[in-house]
């Protein structure tokens, strides 16, 4: 009967997990899960009472440990199967997340995966630190009664101050619990790690933290709370501190060389030199050099450079910085609102008709006031200035009666022949019209002849008759002389 109760108690205790605050052992251990069956609850209560009695008396503890070891030896894989598959107890799924069952609820529901509970973590012998010389509790070995699960005598799972994480077969150095109802406590450590089946139930009131529990499952409540102190180094949203600003001292635009920061940084250095505007053209800065005196900030009380030149360079744009802004700008002058917003009262046709009638009336009034001008001959400026009357066209009036049969016709050239230079002296009308050779005739030939322009007493002198006689005849009744050949 005691064996069956121990078996049922070990089953119910295998469903519970220990909730320890940390690996230092601060705080008491938690109570196991309450089971839904009445018989396991009574067995668990009996086991708890037996564990309390074992803490006060070493002999009772040894007997209780022997009974539990005998019960576990008959049914060893039960805790492993209970922990490897999800719980089918409806009372465990329906309980609120409070008290000792909080770890079990988290393991099966809240974390979103099926946990595999490990009772002993397999460690690599090469990377694991040697804990044999450490006086503290070493995983896998301790100095106390343990719950062994072996099929024969001489096979213990280790030793500890409480129930160890024993389902790992190993070779003990002392007599271990056998399959019989009674056996002594063995002192030894398992030398062969086996498959883990989960942490064993700890019923001692002052028991230490089980070394076989992984660090992630020791305190799930504390592990689920984010540690902002450790995350602050890796959080991308936390603003990082920027290095302090340093004042850059830059020389003239044409100067070369790298800038070296000053050694003294305690006092604020105000740069009064001209700040360059670029480094592209080092030797073509005539315009910048010409305006260097305008770029200098007088003192720090005037503010920064951008604040000092917020209205532009002093003297370039305006000489009166405090003068108000003009109300009229180029934009406003270009887009003035229309003066007369109303439509005109008359159209273009009416205005054009009125203009046409006005021109017609003006022409009529001028025609009435001014008389009509007569047509006049074309008169040049010279004729108008000298007022010379033109000769009338037509034949002159005859002075004497003429005989057109006997008289030589009087023409325009005969009348104007004496006026022409180089013409022979015409004394009478019968004198032939020839070239005057009086001045070129030799002297012997001209002896006895009349001199040029000498008057002759011929009856038919020029001016007395108006025509010449017919050739071969005489003129008049008196004798006359013939024209010499």
From Swiss-Prot:
<dbReference type="GO" id="GO:0045944">
    <property type="term" value="P:positive regulation of transcription by RNA polymerase II"/>
</dbReference>
<dbReference type="GO" id="GO:0005829">
    <property type="term" value="C:cytosol"/>
</dbReference>
<feature type="compositionally biased region" description="Gly residues">
    <location>
        <begin position="151"/>
        <end position="191"/>
    </location>
</feature>
<dbReference type="GO" id="GO:0030317">
    <property type="term" value="P:flagellated sperm motility"/>
</dbReference>
<protein>
    <recommendedName>
        <fullName>Sperm-associated antigen 8</fullName>
    </recommendedName>
</protein>
<dbReference type="Pfam" id="PF22584">
    <property type="entry name" value="CFAP143"/>
</dbReference>
<feature type="region of interest" description="Disordered">
    <location>
        <begin position="127"/>
        <end position="215"/>
    </location>
</feature>
<dbReference type="GO" id="GO:0007338">
    <property type="term" value="P:single fertilization"/>
</dbReference>
<keyword id="KW-0282">Flagellum</keyword>
<keyword id="KW-0206">Cytoskeleton</keyword>
<comment type="subunit">
    <text>Microtubule inner protein component of sperm flagellar doublet microtubules. Interacts with FHL5 (via second LIM domain). Interacts with RANBP9.</text>
</comment>
<keyword id="KW-0221">Differentiation</keyword>
<dbReference type="GO" id="GO:0005654">
    <property type="term" value="C:nucleoplasm"/>
</dbReference>
<comment type="function">
    <text>Microtubule inner protein (MIP) part of the dynein-decorated doublet microtubules (DMTs) in cilia axoneme, which is required for motile cilia beating. Plays a role in spermatogenesis by enhancing the binding of CREM isoform tau to its coactivator FHL5 and increasing the FHL5-regulated transcriptional activation of CREM isoform tau. Involved in the acrosome reaction and in binding of sperm to the zona pellucida. Plays a role in regulation of the cell cycle by controlling progression through the G2/M phase, possibly by delaying the activation of CDK1 which is required for entry into mitosis.</text>
</comment>
<feature type="compositionally biased region" description="Low complexity">
    <location>
        <begin position="132"/>
        <end position="150"/>
    </location>
</feature>
<dbReference type="GO" id="GO:0001669">
    <property type="term" value="C:acrosomal vesicle"/>
</dbReference>
<dbReference type="GO" id="GO:0030154">
    <property type="term" value="P:cell differentiation"/>
</dbReference>
<feature type="region of interest" description="Disordered">
    <location>
        <begin position="1"/>
        <end position="42"/>
    </location>
</feature>
<dbReference type="GO" id="GO:0007283">
    <property type="term" value="P:spermatogenesis"/>
</dbReference>
<dbReference type="GO" id="GO:0036126">
    <property type="term" value="C:sperm flagellum"/>
</dbReference>
<keyword id="KW-0963">Cytoplasm</keyword>
<comment type="similarity">
    <text>Belongs to the SPAG8 family.</text>
</comment>
<dbReference type="GO" id="GO:0160111">
    <property type="term" value="C:axonemal A tubule inner sheath"/>
</dbReference>
<dbReference type="GO" id="GO:0005634">
    <property type="term" value="C:nucleus"/>
</dbReference>
<feature type="region of interest" description="Disordered">
    <location>
        <begin position="75"/>
        <end position="98"/>
    </location>
</feature>
<keyword id="KW-0539">Nucleus</keyword>
<dbReference type="GO" id="GO:0005819">
    <property type="term" value="C:spindle"/>
</dbReference>
<keyword id="KW-0744">Spermatogenesis</keyword>
<dbReference type="GO" id="GO:0005929">
    <property type="term" value="C:cilium"/>
</dbReference>
<keyword id="KW-0278">Fertilization</keyword>
<keyword id="KW-0969">Cilium</keyword>
<dbReference type="GO" id="GO:0001673">
    <property type="term" value="C:male germ cell nucleus"/>
</dbReference>
<dbReference type="GO" id="GO:0008017">
    <property type="term" value="F:microtubule binding"/>
</dbReference>
<feature type="region of interest" description="Mn 2">
    <location>
        <begin position="379"/>
        <end position="393"/>
    </location>
</feature>
<feature type="region of interest" description="Mn 1">
    <location>
        <begin position="327"/>
        <end position="340"/>
    </location>
</feature>
<keyword id="KW-0968">Cytoplasmic vesicle</keyword>
<keyword id="KW-0966">Cell projection</keyword>
<keyword id="KW-0131">Cell cycle</keyword>
<dbReference type="GO" id="GO:0016020">
    <property type="term" value="C:membrane"/>
</dbReference>
<dbReference type="InterPro" id="IPR026124">
    <property type="entry name" value="Sperm-assoc_Ag8"/>
</dbReference>
<dbReference type="GO" id="GO:0005879">
    <property type="term" value="C:axonemal microtubule"/>
</dbReference>
<dbReference type="GO" id="GO:0005737">
    <property type="term" value="C:cytoplasm"/>
</dbReference>
């Amino acid at each position: 009967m005691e064996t069956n109760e121990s078996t049922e108690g070990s089953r119910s205790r295998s469903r519970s997990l220990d909730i320890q605050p940390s690996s230092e052992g601060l705080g008491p251990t938690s109570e196991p899960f309450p089971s839904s069956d009445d018989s396991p609850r009574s067995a668990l209560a009996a086991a708890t009472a037996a564990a309390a009695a074992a803490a006060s008396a070493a002999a009772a503890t040894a007997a209780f440990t022997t009974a539990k070891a005998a019960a576990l030896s008959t049914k060893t894989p039960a805790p492993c199967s209970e922990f490897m598959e999800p719980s089918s107890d409806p009372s465990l799924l329906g309980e609120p997340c409070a008290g000792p069952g909080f770890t079990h609820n988290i393991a099966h529901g809240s974390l979103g995966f099926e946990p595999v509970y490990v009772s002993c973590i397999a460690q690599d012998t090469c990377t694991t630190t040697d804990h044999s010389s450490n006086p503290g509790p070493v995983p896998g070995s301790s100095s106390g009664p343990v719950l062994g699960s072996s099929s024969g005598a001489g096979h213990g799972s280790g030793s500890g101050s409480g129930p160890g994480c024993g389902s790992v077969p190993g070779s003990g150095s002392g007599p271990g619990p056998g399959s019989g109802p009674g056996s002594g406590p063995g002192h030894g450590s398992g030398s062969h790690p086996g498959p883990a089946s989960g942490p064993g139930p700890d019923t001692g009131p002052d028991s230490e933290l089980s070394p076989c529990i992984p660090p992630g499952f020791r305190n799930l409540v504390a592990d689920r709370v984010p540690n902002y102190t450790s995350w602050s180094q890796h959080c991308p949203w936390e603003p990082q501190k920027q290095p302090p600003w340093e004042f850059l001292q830059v020389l003239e635009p044409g100067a070369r060389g790298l800038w070296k920061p000053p050694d003294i940084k305690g006092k604020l250095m105000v740069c009064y030199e001209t700040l360059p505007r670029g480094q592209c053209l080092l030797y073509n800065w005539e315009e910048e050099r010409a305006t260097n005196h305008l770029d200098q900030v007088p003192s720090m009380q005037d503010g920064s450079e951008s604040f000092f030149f917020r209205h532009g360079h002093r003297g370039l744009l305006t000489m009166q910085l405090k003068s108000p802004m003009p109300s009229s700008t180029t934009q406003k002058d270009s887009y003035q609102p229309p003066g007369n917003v109303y439509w005109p009262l008359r159209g273009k046709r009416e205005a054009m008709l009125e203009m046409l009638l006005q021109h017609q009336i003006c022409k009529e009034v001028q025609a009435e006031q001014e008389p009509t001008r007569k047509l006049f001959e074309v008169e040049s400026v010279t004729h108008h200035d000298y007022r010379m009357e033109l000769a009338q066209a037509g034949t002159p009036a005859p002075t004497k009666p003429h005989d057109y049969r006997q008289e030589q016709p009087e023409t325009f050239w005969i009348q104007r022949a004496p006026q022409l230079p180089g013409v022979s002296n015409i004394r009478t009308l019968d004198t032939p019209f020839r070239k005057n050779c009086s001045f070129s005739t030799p002297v012997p030939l001209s002896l006895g002849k009349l001199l040029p322009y000498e008057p002759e007493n011929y009856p038919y002198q020029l001016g007395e008759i108006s025509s010449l006689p017919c050739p071969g005849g005489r003129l008049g009744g008196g004798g006359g002389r013939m024209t010499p050949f």
